[in-house]
Amino acid sequence: MATAPLAFRLPFPFSFPSASRPPPSRILAPPTPRRLPLRLAAAAARRFRPPTADDEPPEAAEDSSHGLTRYDQLARSVERARIRQPEITPDNPLFSSPSTAGGGGGGSYDPDDEFFDEIDRAIAEKREEFTRRGLIKPSPASPPPSQSQPEDEDLTDELSPEEVIDLDEIRKLQGLSVVSVADEEDEEVEGGEDEDDGLPLDEDGEGFDVAEELGLEGARMRQPAFRMTLAELLDESKLVPVAVTGDQDVALAGVQRDASLVAAGDLFVCVGEDGLAGLTEADKRGAVAVVADQDLNIEGTLACRALVIVDDILTALRVLPACLYSRPSMNMAIIGVTGTDGVTTTTHLVKAMYEAMGVRTGLVGVLGTYAFSSNKLDARPDASSDPIAAQKLMATMLHNGTEAVVLEKGTDGMPPSGVDSEIDYDIAVLTNVRHTDEENGMTYEEYMSRMASLFSRMVDPERHRKVVNIDDPSAPFFAAQGGHDVPVVTYSFENKKADVHTLKYQLSLFETEVLVQTPHGILEISSGLLGRDNIYSILATVAVGIAVGAPLEDIVRGIEEVDAIPGRCELIDEEQAFGVIVDHARTPEALSRLLDGVRELGPRRIVTVVGCCGEKERGKRPVMTKIAADKSDVVMLTSDNPANEDPLDILDDMLAGVGWTMEEYLKYGANDYYPPLPNGHRLFLHDIRRVAVRAAVAMGEQGDVVVITGKGNDTYQIEGDKNEFFDDREECREALQYVDQLHRAGIDTSEFPWRLPESH
């Protein structure tokens, strides 16, 4: 690298003090009932335990008036016991089992026996009573002396009195049955049918973990098992195949369209050229049947047992998994959130609000899939756009007790309209619509049609609800989709005609405070989510809460529970005096909105790190630099997944955004000085992203905001053929550990190259 080398190692992390706020009081009113009664998650049990005493109880004073110490008293007691020991025989009732002592099998009491006291008498009488009533089983009788082993009788004469007593105890123990682990399991299963013997078992013979019952983290996720014959599946799905060959009674355990995911017993849906190419692999992995839209020769070439030919393979793709997995969305509340921006944040806030109401809520989105709480499921980021993955994930959630699911219906990789029409949505939410043909590869009409498919299913006024942002010009179009008598809840930043709107708000580097007007009262919300765009997500969540009749206190509590969305204007807080934000903005539009939002926070300076990916989208590189240079006080250009392209070539393209070339920049570096841009802002570059991120964080001073863009929550860097771990957030945290040391050393980190005080 031709830039001036750094004279020291740059490490980093960091964070901002978040204002503490008292939790709002809980409203005890339950949420409005839905189609099916919502089972409220159990709250963690709290048991009162009295505090332990500060001091141990005083020890009784030793009584030595008789001239004997405690040790002497103990020695005398032992000696007396040894003297009496020969008088104790195995025939004494004290050493006999209840059956032999009384002959009744239920235990008895001998009034002439000096070894029984009042407690022994009560126990024996109760045992006899319970035995007569059949509440307990009689103790097994000891074998008669005649059945004892002859060798044991011969040994008795040779044993000491102590050994005789031990032998008698051994004989008693021989009458006990040894219970194996398998026997205990059998008894537990039998006892599961009797409600008096314990908690009832669930249908698959396994009880929920305690953590799972309480809705806590770490609960064990149980995988449901499905089984249906091909004939039953075709009948249930109402598909009319063109032809069916092979065994229609073959049992199916799952559905897949990706050959690499096929497991034994699966039905393989052969879609397009990729499906045909993966047919052999699916067969080797154990696919037992194939669905295709063209005739295939499976006899003699494939081991699968059946072939179904259909006219519309996409219809089969969405209907078959829904039927095989028993249409799980019919038994849960499903909230779909669509739009261009703010979709991810809104889904997380809605999930948190439902859980604040006590509803076990799952989420399917690009940042992860959760069954409920923080219990994550293994799923691809595009799972909500995959009809097979979505149905299977929802079936798993339902099997684990999930009552509501929030689905993220973003525009990235959006599927054709209607591909998820087998999901029974209850609420449709629109954030906003921003469309560019170049970014989405779709016309405006196609783009709108795909998003509107969610709202077109809102037809039942008793169950469905529409939630729209009326600040967006497309809001009337979406509100008109589906049934016209379905209630519509509107929200707006400033429009007072909306059902939910802001009355007052305050933005800062560390939190957002907003006063929200609703039809049922005013909400005061303090959130760790930064910027104006996140206020829209908060308003959308409040509108969903109003639509379902959620208690206002639960709405506030749920929203305030979410401190950050990974990689979405995420604040890195290590208690430093300046802000550090990590965001996934990687397009000119997203970068512009992000920096505008950061400027609204009122920072002293904005220091921005921006990079562009290799091997694609060369046209946007100078545009990204131009936006960053115009809206930031300091810009640090760097690489972002350069792949097989030279990072210096990428940076050369980016420098064109400010009218520089790489040759000019290197010439400045040779003179140890980089001049300001025409607007007075500064620009530096470093081809190593780790150095660029850490250097930018080290430039931060009190009141500044350092913005790291491009990766967000992504945790990898692609260089050449290597895909290595890299996390902007961890780099920032590591860097922040050393910022104070650099500043105390007097090093000027405000610009490149860094200088020691004597070099000024």
Curated annotation (Swiss-Prot):
Compositionally biased residues, Pro residues: 20-34
Keywords: Chloroplast, Plastid, Transcription, Transcription regulation, Transit peptide
The organelle targeting sequence, given as a residue range: 1-59
Protein name: UDP-N-acetylmuramoyl-L-alanyl-D-glutamate--2,6-diaminopimelate ligase MurE homolog, chloroplastic
Predominant location category: plastid
Classification via InterPro entries: Mur-like_cat_sf (IPR036565), Mur_ligase_C (IPR004101), Mur_ligase_C_dom_sf (IPR036615), Mur_ligase_cen (IPR013221), MurE/MurF_N (IPR035911), UDP-N-AcMur-Glu-dNH2Pim_ligase (IPR005761)
Keyword Protein biosynthesis (UniProt): no
Compositionally skewed regions (Acidic residues) per UniProt: 53-62, 150-159, 182-205
SUPFAM superfamilies for the chain: MurD-like peptide ligases, catalytic domain (SSF53623), MurD-like peptide ligases, peptide-binding domain (SSF53244), MurE/MurF N-terminal domain (SSF63418)
Knockout mutant characteristics: Pale yellow-green leaf phenotype. Reduced levels of plastid ribosomes and defects in plastid mRNA metabolism.
